[in-house]
Amino acid sequence: MKKIPQISDAELEVMKVIWKHSSINTNEVIKELSKTSTWSPKTIQTMLLRLIKKGALNHHKEGRVFVYTPNIDESDYIEVKSHSFLNRFYNGTLNSMVLNFLENDQLSGEEINELYQILEEHKNRKKE
């Protein structure tokens, strides 16, 4: 797994668009982000440049536009950020996080049943 750079929340929104398309040009990134944000094209281009400098994106020129591809996998990013979150707030244990949600009534009965099912399926796969 590659080293994961620090990515701001805004930059993460840009990365999500690029992960979704895997290869996308500047105009398409701007068009996609204009659906969900009020950022100007210049702001989006600045974020793209920052992500390149951080090593999160690769780019090359095709004709008159730049094409961007992710340099880090979305699954790797999520894994690192998930572990960071657990370490930061729950001393690295998933049990503590789930217990916190249970104790604060933040999980419905349906969600608890779904978690139970997931755990059972995972347990059965481990046995095989």
Curated annotation (Swiss-Prot):
Keywords, ordered alphabetically: Antibiotic resistance, Cytoplasm, DNA-binding, Repressor, Transcription, Transcription regulation
Disulfides per UniProt: none
GO BP terms: negative regulation of DNA-templated transcription; response to antibiotic
One example GO MF annotation: DNA binding
Keyword Amino-acid biosynthesis recorded: no
Coiled coil: none
PTM comment, free text: Upon exposure to beta-lactams, proteolytic cleavage at a single site may impair dimerization and abolish repressor activity.
DNA-binding region as annotated in the record: 6-70
Site, Cleavage: residue positions: 100-101
Region Important for dimerization, residue ranges: 73-128
Gene Ontology annotations for the cellular component aspect, listed alphabetically: cytoplasm
Subcellular location as annotated: Cytoplasm
Any Pfam family the entry gives: Penicillinase_R
Top-level taxon in the UniProt lineage: Bacteria
Primary localization class, coarse: cytoplasm
InterPro entries, A to Z: BlaI_family, WH-like_DNA-bd_sf, WH_DNA-bd_sf
Purpose of the protein: Transcriptional repressor that constitutively blocks expression of beta-lactamase. Regulates genes involved in antibiotic resistance. Binds DNA as a dimer.
Quaternary structure and partners: Homodimer.
UniProt family annotation: Belongs to the BlaI transcriptional regulatory family.
Protein name: Penicillinase repressor
